[in-house]
Design a protein with these regions (language model features):
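Non-catalytic tandem-repeat scaffold regions and their flanking low-complexity/translocation tails
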Residues: 2, 9-185
C-alpha cells in the first residue's frame, strides 16, 4: 500500500519528466525550423545578402511568399525566413545568375521564384567553376560536361560541341550534338 506522500512524489517526478520532454521537444522544433516569420528575425544572425543563420547553425534565406489572409480577397506578399534552403550553400560566394540559376564556389543551383518563395535545388552533377547560363536563356545552363534544362541534364548533348538553333526572337529551338537533337518546348 502506498501513502499520499509517495503518490505526490510520483506525480511530481512525472510532471518534471513531462516538462523536460516538452522543453526538449521545443528545442528540437527550434533547431529544425522550416521557416521563421519576420518578427522572429532576432533569433537569426545576418551572414550576407539574403542569408541568415540560427544559433544551432541552420541556414535561412530571407524571401517572400504569396499567402491567403483572413479578411483579404487577394493574395498578400509576406516576407519570411525559409529554412528549407540547401544547408551547404556558401552564403559568402552565392550569386544569382541571369535566369533560374545560381552558384557559389562549391555548387550550382536551380533557383527560381515560386508563390511560396524561392525554390533552391542543388544540381548535384554541375561543376560550379564552369557553370554558366546559355546567353539570353533563363531555362538553360551548361558546365564543361553537361547541358541543363532547369534541373534536368540533357543526355548525349556535349556542351563543347553542340550547335544551338534559335528562332527569330532568340529563343532556343534545338540543341544538336553529334547524332542527338534536343527539341526545346
Amino acid at each position: 500500500m502506498t501513502n499520499c506522500n509517495e503518490k505526490r512524489q510520483d506525480n511530481d517526478q512525472s510532471s518534471e519528466q513531462h516538462n523536460d520532454n516538452k522543453i526538449k521537444t521545443e528545442e528540437i522544433k527550434q533547431n529544425d525550423l522550416a521557416q521563421l516569420e519576420l518578427k522572429d528575425s532576432s533569433l537569426l544572425t545576418h551572414i550576407k545578402g539574403q542569408f541568415y543563420e540560427s544559433k544551432p547553425g541552420q541556414l535561412f534565406e530571407r524571401t517572400f511568399s504569396d499567402r491567403e489572409m483572413k479578411g483579404v480577397d487577394t493574395l498578400v506578399s509576406v516576407e519570411y525566413f525559409n529554412g528549407k534552403t540547401p544547408q551547404d550553400i556558401d552564403p559568402l560566394t552565392f550569386k544569382q545568375l541571369d535566369g533560374w540559376f545560381a552558384k557559389d564556389k562549391n555548387s550550382a543551383y536551380y533557383y527560381r521564384p515560386t508563390s511560396g518563395g524561392m525554390l533552391t535545388i542543388k544540381l548535384e552533377k554541375a561543376d560550379s567553376k564552369s557553370f554558366k547560363i546559355l546567353t539570353g536563356q533563363y531555362l538553360y545552363a551548361v558546365d564543361y560536361k553537361h547541358v541543363f534544362r532547369e534541373t534536368e541534364i540533357l543526355e548525349n548533348i556535349n556542351p563543347q560541341k553542340m550547335k544551338i538553333i534559335k528562332d527569330n526572337d532568340g529563343k532556343i529551338v534545338k540543341l544538336i550534338s553529334g547524332q542527338t537533337t534536343y527539341i526545346a518546348d
